[in-house]
């Protein structure tokens, strides 16, 4: 892979890191489970093909207590009963937001299920989580970010 200019540096990177910190705080304050957030980050990263973020968030998910088996089958989440109703709603919402250019909107049924299963604060935090991971994915993919020796 051709080496490219690193995009995750400088003041804009610091601003993005600050945004990520605010998203993490909002998620915690809203009572969103850390494992659910990591599933969301992993699913968006799968769709976007971001190996750097997949590596990072798989390690963070396991550290948060996520079962590796669920990570192995995450791409096929609809085909298994391993995910809760709330996790399924979050994953469907993540896919809709990540692939928004396919529909030009979040489908009404996906939105309705998300707001049925999450409080308003949780829904807002979930939306910002999806926005943030999609931004990170694009930065890492565009700059050909290399994997560290060990997932961090």
Model-derived features with residue positions:
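Hydrophobic alpha-helical segments
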Residues: 1-152
